[in-house]
């Protein structure tokens, strides 16, 4: 899996915006990626040093549209903590 395929998109919410002050950045990542792969991908793409990676898995939710039942996509979210002195890569 390529590094650019692991990181899907940044997650911009009120909580993630508050965590940016503490050098914590949130991303949606591929569901098959592990913490080591996520760390290597972030360091390679953004040229920063990663201190720690926390990962959360979200199950698919059952949804109904009219008479049809289906599921939302499952997803995996990673909170990446940068080392002190790293460059702020969203600015």
UniProtKB/Swiss-Prot annotation:
One of its GO terms (molecular function) is structural constituent of ribosome. InterPro entries: Nucleotide-bd_a/b_plait_sf, Ribosomal_uL23-like, Ribosomal_uL23/eL15/eS24_sf. GO terms for cellular component: ribonucleoprotein complex; ribosome. GO terms for biological process: translation. Signal peptide: none annotated. HAMAP family: Ribosomal_uL23_B. Belongs to the universal ribosomal protein uL23 family. Part of the 50S ribosomal subunit. Contacts protein L29, and trigger factor when it is bound to the ribosome. One of the early assembly proteins it binds 23S rRNA. One of the proteins that surrounds the polypeptide exit tunnel on the outside of the ribosome. Forms the main docking site for trigger factor binding to the ribosome. This is Large ribosomal subunit protein uL23. It comes from Macrococcus caseolyticus (strain JCSC5402).
């Amino acid at each position: 899996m390529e590094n650019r395929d692991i990181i899907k998109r940044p997650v911009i919410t009120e909580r993630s915006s508050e965590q940016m002050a503490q050098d914590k950045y949130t991303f949606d990542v591929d569901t098959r990626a592990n913490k080591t792969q996520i760390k290597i991908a972030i360091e390679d793409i953004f040229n920063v040093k990663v201190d720690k990676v926390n990962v959360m898995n979200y199950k698919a939710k059952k949804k109904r549209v009219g008479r049809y039942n289906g599921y939302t996509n499952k997803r995996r979210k990673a909170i990446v903590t940068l080392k002190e002195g790293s460059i702020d890569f969203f600015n």
